[in-house]
């Protein structure tokens, strides 16, 4: 006696929230017919900490340690967008040296984030070895962060009007040495993985998103660029000093999991190119705008007197009044467009701070991609989107 697969009721399986391939506390409720996925529902909120509400009774300086807990693998980007918002709102100019230092830190953070995406993604689909390799390069990046900021993760390095401290003596040479070491390693990963027939069977044509779908779903970052859309906020919004550097947007046209992998590999190479240029062009001068701490106290330029000069070396005051305006600021994070919508009301606290996390928006398309695929493909699709639950649940 044989029963057709269509006659069997779907089996409902819960993947997560503590599944080894879930990339955090995400839960998928999956309806299966044999090995085929019939339906899928995402259950979020296991890591919700009320980050937007916390911001409403913290000054920007007090809130900076909180933002590193959104995307805790690329913390420089959350810091960058958090200080960029008040800077744009109050029209604070940052010194050129500070801008270059920020770009260097952001690109190092991008490489570290992509490396820690690459290892687990390959481990999920059966290639265990690169998972152990990527920690070599990531460790070197964290050593550079530790030398410059004092922290390996959760750096708390960016400030309104600049950065917290200048680069230490010898740091630039160390960073150039890292660039020289890292580039051949990225090519090594490509040789190990890209042409591997088992890897290609697992990723080619899996999780296909066409160009129009990617735009309609509001995707950003590698997920959008892998579908043939050349959209990178570093080119479009002209923030920091990216315009002064010579680099290209990395993109692919296929729109599948393989294309998303290739975009991230190419982005790591491009980040090293940006790093080398920024380190070479790094100007002298101050690393922080000390006028920034006198934000909105008077509309015209403040007269310096003898009393003020004794405080000239102090860091930006935590009581920066935000003008009664609203502003949306975004940066190109490793996972996509990370944005903040900030509303000031002439007080030291923001009236509202809305976070636009890339992972949360990119996660919307996952149920559509999974339907009709095999159970084993769920891990591939979810891994290729690259999500961090800290920023999804906030």
Curated annotation (Swiss-Prot):
GO cellular component: chloroplast thylakoid membrane
Domain of life: Eukaryota
Keyword set includes Zinc-finger: no
Chemical reaction(s) catalysed: a plastoquinone + NADH + (n+1) H(+)(in) = a plastoquinol + NAD(+) + n H(+)(out); a plastoquinone + NADPH + (n+1) H(+)(in) = a plastoquinol + NADP(+) + n H(+)(out)
Molecular function via GO: NAD binding; oxidoreductase activity, acting on NAD(P)H, quinone or similar compound as acceptor; quinone binding
Keyword Chloroplast: yes
Disulfide partners: none
GO biological process, one term: photosynthesis, light reaction
Its membrane topology: Peripheral membrane protein
EC number: 7.1.1.-
Key words, A-Z: Chloroplast, Membrane, NAD, NADP, Plastid, Plastoquinone, Quinone, Thylakoid, Translocase, Transport
Pfam (any one): Complex1_49kDa
Subcellular location: Plastid, Chloroplast thylakoid membrane
The protein's role, per its UniProt record: NDH shuttles electrons from NAD(P)H:plastoquinone, via FMN and iron-sulfur (Fe-S) centers, to quinones in the photosynthetic chain and possibly in a chloroplast respiratory chain. The immediate electron acceptor for the enzyme in this species is believed to be plastoquinone. Couples the redox reaction to proton translocation, and thus conserves the redox energy in a proton gradient.
NCBIfam families the UniProt entry points to: PRK06075.1, PRK07415.1
Family statement drawn from the similarity comment of this UniProt entry: Belongs to the complex I 49 kDa subunit family.
Subunit structure, as described in the record: NDH is composed of at least 16 different subunits, 5 of which are encoded in the nucleus.
Protein name per its UniProtKB record: NAD(P)H-quinone oxidoreductase subunit H, chloroplastic
Gene transcribed to yield this protein: ndhH
């Amino acid at each position: 006696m044989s029963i057709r697969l269509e006659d069997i009721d779907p089996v409902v399986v819960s993947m997560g929230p503590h599944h080894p391939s879930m990339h955090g506390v995400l839960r998928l409720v999956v309806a299966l017919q044999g090995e085929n996925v019939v339906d899928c529902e995402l259950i979020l909120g296991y890591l919700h900490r009320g980050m937007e509400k916390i911001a409403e009774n913290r000054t920007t300086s007090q809130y900076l340690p909180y933002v590193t807990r959104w995307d805790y693998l690329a913390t420089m980007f959350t810091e960058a967008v958090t200080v960029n918002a008040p800077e744009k709102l109050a029209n604070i100019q940052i010194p050129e040296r500070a801008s270059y230092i920020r770009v260097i830190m952001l690109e190092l953070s991008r490489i570290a984030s992509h490396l820690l995406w690459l290892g687990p993604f390959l481990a999920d689909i059966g290639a265990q070895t690169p998972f152990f390799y990527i920690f070599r390069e990531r460790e070197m990046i964290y050593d550079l962060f530790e030398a410059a900021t004092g922290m390996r993760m959760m750096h708390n390095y960016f400030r309104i009007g600049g950065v917290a401290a200048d680069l230490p003596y010898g740091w630039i040479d160390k960073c150039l040495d890292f660039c020289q070491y890292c580039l051949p390693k990225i090519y090594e990963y490509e040789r190990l993985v890209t042409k591997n027939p088992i890897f290609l069977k697992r990723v080619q044509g899996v999780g296909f998103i066409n160009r129009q779908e990617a735009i309609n779903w509001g995707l950003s970052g590698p997920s959008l660029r892998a579908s043939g859309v050349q959209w990178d906020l570093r080119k479009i919004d002209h923030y920091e000093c990216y315009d002064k550097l010579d680099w290209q947007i990395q993109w692919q046209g296929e729109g599948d999991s393989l294309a998303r992998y290739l975009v991230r590999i190419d982005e790591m190479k491009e980040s090293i190119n940006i790093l080398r240029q920024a380190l070479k062009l790094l100007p002298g001068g101050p690393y922080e705008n000390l006028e920034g701490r006198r934000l909105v106290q008077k509309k015209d330029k403040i007269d310096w007197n003898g009393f003020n000069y004794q405080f000239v070396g102090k860091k930006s005051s935590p009581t920066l009044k935000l003008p009664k305006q609203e502003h949306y600021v975004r940066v190109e994070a490793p996972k996509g467009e990370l944005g903040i919508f900030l509303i000031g009301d002439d007080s030291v606290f923001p009236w509202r701070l809305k976070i636009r996390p890339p992972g949360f928006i990119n996660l919307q398309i996952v149920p559509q991609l999974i339907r009709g695929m095999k159970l084993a493909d769920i891990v591939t699709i979810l891994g290729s989107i690259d999500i961090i639950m800290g920023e999804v649940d906030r």
